[in-house]
């Protein structure tokens, strides 16, 4: 597959000539199949006791779109040249479908992250939660509207349409598109995380040395040493920041290292691969931590006030265990 330059400012491209002996279609099928299996794996291993949010709905919709993409490419590959309702489908449509999906995925990073951040911010500042049925319906409609909007933009943008028509006769070569949205989003997250770590690295080290893994209500949790509290209000930002960093890196450190490696080597990943469920859950955890830090003065130990992360139990950053009966004998102690 070959990546070609475009005038669209939201994308970057690189060119490379694939070996003629390599079947690009089979390679594309294997890539999409691997992505679908990875999406299914992440959706199965995530925590099941999570409350639904916009990001949860979008992750499931993305997994469904990837599955539909795999089915369509498989059908086009198997039949190769066939006619349906007077429309002739060939190998060219495999390339066309991949290009459209790549453009759509490439434009989704900023809107999805913005909507997820607004969702968590509103849920945190709201005293009472709305009806669960109406909230789920709102999430579903928002996800559908997001997909429709981005597809309408991709199909209606003159520059993208011109790029798609340029390669209409090309069968052996297919342009692959690389979104710059994910690049800048990843770079921004890593910079914020680095600054936060530099500001509170001493507290982070001290906290890691004091962390205990304890059994709390028949679940293994990280037990942070809390100073005496007279209420259930959370600690100030300076105290909360190292706890958030430890929780985030404790879960997503391999993914953070992968992002550093990708940015350092300037690896160009096609947009249809880069937009995936693990990446969205990684961004989701970062957004939740950021919302917690900015709104630490509003947080209380109440289940309804905490957006639930499918991979991180953020309550261990806030909940002081005052009654020793609630905490069983520590299973282990982590010492740096």
Swiss-Prot record:
Residue intervals on the Extracellular side: 1-21, 78-95, 158-187, 265-272
Localisation per UniProt entry: Cell membrane
Topology class, membrane: Multi-pass membrane protein
GO molecular-function terms, A-Z: G protein-coupled receptor activity
Domain of life per record: Eukaryota
Xref: InterPro entries: GPCR_Rhodpsn_7TM, GPR160
Cytoplasmic side: 43-56, 117-136, 209-243, 294-336
Alphabetical keyword list: Cell membrane, G-protein coupled receptor, Glycoprotein, Membrane, Receptor, Transducer, Transmembrane, Transmembrane helix
Transmembrane spans: 22-42, 57-77, 96-116, 137-157, 188-208, 244-264, 273-293
Residues of this chain annotated as glycosylated in UniProt: 8
Name by which UniProt lists this protein: Probable G-protein coupled receptor 160
Species name: Rattus norvegicus (Rat)
Taxonomic path: Eukaryota, Metazoa, Chordata, Craniata, Vertebrata
């Amino acid at each position: 597959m070959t990546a070609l330059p475009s005038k669209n400012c939201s994308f970057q491209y690189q060119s490379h000539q694939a070996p003629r002996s390599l079947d690009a279609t089979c390679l594309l099928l294997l890539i999409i199949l691997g992505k679908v299996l990875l999406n299914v794996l992440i959706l199965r291993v995530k925590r099941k006791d999570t409350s639904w949010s916009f990001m949860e709905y979008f992750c499931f919709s993305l997994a469904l779109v990837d599955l539909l993409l795999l089915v369509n490419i498989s059908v086009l590959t198997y039949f190769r040249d066939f006619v349906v309702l007077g429309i002739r489908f060939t190998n060219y449509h495999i390339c066309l479908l991949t290009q459209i999906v790549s453009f759509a995925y490439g434009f989704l990073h900023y809107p999805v992250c913005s909507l997820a951040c607004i969702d968590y911010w509103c849920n945190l500042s709201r005293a009472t939660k709305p009806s669960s049925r109406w909230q789920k319906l709102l999430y579903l409609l928002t996800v559908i509207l997001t997909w429709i909007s981005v597809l309408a933009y991709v199909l209606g943008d003159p520059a993208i349409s011109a790029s798609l028509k340029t390669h209409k006769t090309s069968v052996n070569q297919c342009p692959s598109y690389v979104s710059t949205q994910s690049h800048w989003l990843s770079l921004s997250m890593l910079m914020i995380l680095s600054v936060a770590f530099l500001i509170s690295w001493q507290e982070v080290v001290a906290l890691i040395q004091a962390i205990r893994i304890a059994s709390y209500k028949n679940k293994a949790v990280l037990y942070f040493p809390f100073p005496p509290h007279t209420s259930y209000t959370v600690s100030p930002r300076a105290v909360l920041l190292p706890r958030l960093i430890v929780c985030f890196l404790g879960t997503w450190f391999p993914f953070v290292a992968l992002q550093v490696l990708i940015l350092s080597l300037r690896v160009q990943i096609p947009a249809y691969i880069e937009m995936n469920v693990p990446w969205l859950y990684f961004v989701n955890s970062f957004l939740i931590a950021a919302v917690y830090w900015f709104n630490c003065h509003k947080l209380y130990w109440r289940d309804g006030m905490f957006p639930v992360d499918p991979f991180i139990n953020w309550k261990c950053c806030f909940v002081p265990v005052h009654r020793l009966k609630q905490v069983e004998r520590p299973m282990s102690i982590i010492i740096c």
